Amino acid sequence: MGWEALGLWGADAVRIEPLAGGSSNDVWSVRVGGKLAVGRLGKRSDADLAWEAELLQHLDREGLTVPVPIPTTDGRLFADGLMVITYMEGGPPRTKADWRRVAETLRELHRLTRGWPQRPGWRSSTDLLDAETGTRIDLAAMPPEAVARCRAAWARLVGRERCVVHGNPNNPGNVRITAGRVALIDWDEAHVDVPDLDLVLPHNGADLVGEAYDIAAQASSAWEAAVCWDDDYSKERLAEVRAIPAATDR
């Protein structure tokens, strides 16, 4: 149905202008019920959209500032690949203090989602120690040496508690800050994983030090290399993942 589905939000629902969006959606500002909102049209499955909608509603109820789904006139949270969500005011984080606030918000996200079910079709970084595919990741498409490096980085996360991670919070465009709150937007990459992946932030906003920072940075670079393979960005991220020392004969 495409954008014609916007009519399910009311006869006065209209598109306004395109917005920068995630990798999986056509994103526009829209007006629904006389209020500014955001419409995202993509090819995600109903199960995927239901997972995201339930997550955002849960986080909103628990006091996090997130875009929440606006129902259609008959009460659906999405229809024909279209989800309409509330518009978030604010600008991107710029200073170390801003990024510390982002880290605090991420840690609250992680606390609120311990034990959350995995996003349909996704796998965590530690799942990929054995599996080869999961949504946008296909390790079989990467050189074996690159896969070995990524898995070595993820192996350091084994045994850690899992929760929902935002998946791309170090992109300033995915955060909206005002004096009173921090809003996380663009949940395309959210899934269940180890929280370390969310905490490699500009200005080291999460204040990780020593081995904790190294583990998180290596695992995060490996994840972004795998999920984006094989464009220039993914190769830059792979270059940050340490090579595995060659075995030596004794």
What spans do the regions from the language model cover?
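Regulatory N- and C-terminal appendages and interdomain linkers associated
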Residues: M1-I16, A148, A243-R250
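A conserved alpha-helical element in kinase catalytic cores
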Residues: R40-D80, P92-L109
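A glycine-centered beta->alpha junction motif in the catalytic cores
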Residues: G81-T95, A131-L139, A222-L238
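A cross-family kinase active-site recognition segment
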Residues: P93-E145, A152, E161-R162
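Active-site Asp-x-Gly
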Residues: R176-A217
